Amino acid sequence: MIVLSLFDGMSCGQIAFDKLGIRFDGVNNKYFASEIKKHAIKVTKNNYPNTIHIGDVTKVSYKNGTLYTENGEYEVGEIDYLIGGSPCQDFSVAKLNNVKYGLEGDKSKLFYEYLRLLREINPKYFLLENVRMEEESKKTIR
């Protein structure tokens, strides 16, 4: 099984797979993680040492079974799962300063990177999670 996790954070995706009894050994089952926060990467490396860290999502692409990243190229064949939760600060209904940029905000526009890779990869399964948001952002996503 091949999993690509975007905005991986501390690898909550692997926690969920773990609870299902699925482990990533880096050989038969591979978990590729795109994350840029150093502390989150450190937590993942400690808890899931077989994770393949691929860096910044904006520098990831996929073509003909190859995953191209800032940390190298990987012959992966088909990707089974694309998972992730793009940054939400710009469109969350809980925005504290009451300024909402929607999906055009500096952080939340990374949603489009998820969408780009979803189209490139066409995985068997995908999961995009996020927060409760304003109606305008919901319309854009639909």
Predicted feature descriptions by range:
Residues M1-R142:
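Conserved active-site and SAM-binding loop architecture
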